[in-house]
Each structure stands twice: as C-alpha cells, then as structure tokens.
Amino acid sequence: MQTGRGFDSHQLHNQMNSPIAKWWKPIKGVNQMSLSKVLCTLCPRYCKIGDGQRGFCFIRKNIDGTLYQEGYGKVIGLAVDPIEKKPLNHFLPSSTILSFGTAGCNLGCKFCQNWHMSKVKDDNKISQYVTPEQIVKVANDNGCKSIAYTYNEPIIFGEFIIEVSKLARQSGLKNVMVTNGYITKEAREEVFQYIDAANVDLKAFTETFYHNLTYSHLEDVLDTIKWLYNETDVWIELTNLIIPTHNDNRYEIIDMINWILENCSDKLPLHFTAFHPDFKMKDLPRTSRDTLNGARKVARNMGMKYVYTGNVSDSKSQTTYCPQCKSSMISRIWHSVIPFWKLTCDCGYKLEGVFK
C-alpha cells in the first residue's frame, strides 16, 4: 500500500518510531478479508486484530497485515522515585529508581488507579518520544540505581523494555518491572531477560474477580509468578490491592497465602495495599487500616516472614522484622527508610533480598 509522497506504509510507521512487533503471526483465512488479520501472541488475550485496528492494549496496531508496536518510546510519567514506592522492600533499599510507563494496558481493571494513563486513547497528547539511550542517561545523571517499567502495564511495551533494559544493564543499572503478570510463555523469556526484580500485582485470588473486574484470568498470572520465582533469577515481591467487598474475604486471603507457601516460599515479600475509589469503582469506601492489618496478621500467622501494608502511613506494618528474633532490621515511614538499617540481624540472621 502506498501513502502520500510515495512512502510505503511500513516505512512510514518505522520513521514514526513504531517498530514491527515481536510477538505475532498472520492468521490464515479463507477469504481476502481474513488474510490481513494478525494474532498477537504477547499476552494470553491473543487478540485477533483486523487491518487498521488495535489490540485490547491500544498500542499494538495492524497495518496492512503487519503488527506494529505503536507505544515504542512514547514515554509517560518519567520520574525519580524511592524504590520503596514500587513497592520493593528487599531490593536495593533506600535507593532511587527512574520510573516511566506508556499509554495502554492489557487488562481492563474497573478499579484502575492509573486509568489516566492506561485508558488513554490518544497517547500523543500526553507522551513524549524518548530513546533507550536517553532514559539510561537520565537515570545515571540523577544517581538512580535502577530503572522501573511501571505505571501502566509494561508487558505491552515489551520491545522497548528489551532495548532499554539491555543498555541499562550494560551501564551498571538494575531493571525492575511492576506488572500484572499477564504474559504468554512465548514472550516472557525475552521480555524478562534483563529484568532484575519484579513486583507482580496479584489482584485477587478468585477467577470470578479476574473475569468480572479485570477481563482476564487468574491462572495465567499464577503461572507467571511460579515461573518467575522458581525458574528465573528475578527477585520477586507480590502486591495485593484489597478492595472492600470484592477481595477482602478472610478465606480468600487464606487460599492465596496457602498457594504462595506451596508454590513459592514463606520468604516471598507480600504487600497488602489500600484501595481508593477511582475510575469505575468510585462508590466504594477506601480500604481501612484495620482491614489491611487483619490481612497482614492472617499471612504472618500462616508463616509468611515478610508482610507489609501500603498506601497508608503505618511504620509498624512497613518495617522489616527479623524472622528469627523479631527485632527491627529496616524501619520505614511511608516510602522512606529510617537510617541505621541492617541486613544482618544481631542474632545472626541474614535478610533475604538483593542489596547491591
């Protein structure tokens, strides 16, 4: 197909910084219309995308039977954060991290806390094009120890992650993904190949919740968590956003903890965080501190060693305690680490995590 001034449409998209996507294949059809459809294989949604259309995530588009990654380098929200904000409590504590995202998401969470980015339909209005080299330079210039792919769902801009994370590692920086974990087996090894740590958002522990409130499936997320913890060197922590009346049932929390203990470890850090009314779920109250601490108590009583609360100010529940003697090792207030923290307790216990 030709466009104005004799440009081929594929060449035009490449000039506009939209590279051909990595994970897709053409759909073999029985008529001319189906010949131009493509199957995206990046996430378990497996979108079948017609010519000129986008996938569910918004930033992957079919042009003349070729799938393009239209979010490549279109950065939103470039900012320096404390790493505890991700949240990661056992990965380079007290360091700063350069964070960014793009438009779009491969889930449809009705409670999305970043909907102004994940649900945007014209990313050109709020994004700026930034090269991988520029991102790494900004991180180094600001004294950051790592780069976070976050805010929306980074899986959907996996091609860009690979380029940035490779350069970051070469320059001595660590790489962090804050992710919903909704990715296929075909894509995950490439996307995570240079990732050092991940916080996976385990949104609930029922298929009903995932189906009705996120338009996705729980089992695919659990498979990613198991793979990350058992088959990679990625440091992993989990976050569970507790939403009143939807996933705050004590028995659901017990089921989730049992699964973590059976499939991962009692030393996997777990963050229970507070929901605030947003997007399509503004009719619900904020999560109470008592609810968060109740979930934390259940998890600790079941044997989890590192359980935290978030989105509330509670130094006690945000402090890291020695699993052996219960003394404080890393004290925090909100996202700040109080000085004089230690990685080896006075009793001799060495804290699990990545610290250099």
Model-derived segments and spans:
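N-terminal [4Fe-4S]-dependent radical SAM core
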Residues: 16-40, 44-102, 115-119, 318, ...
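Auxiliary Fe-S-binding modules of radical SAM enzymes
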Residues: 16-51, 245-356
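Short cysteine/histidine-rich metal-coordination sites, predominantly Zn2+-binding motifs
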Residues: 56-66, 71-78, 122-135, 336-346
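Short, charged beta->alpha transition segments
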Residues: 84-88, 107, 127-139
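Conserved AdoMet/S-adenosylmethionine-binding subsite of the radical SAM
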Residues: 132-287
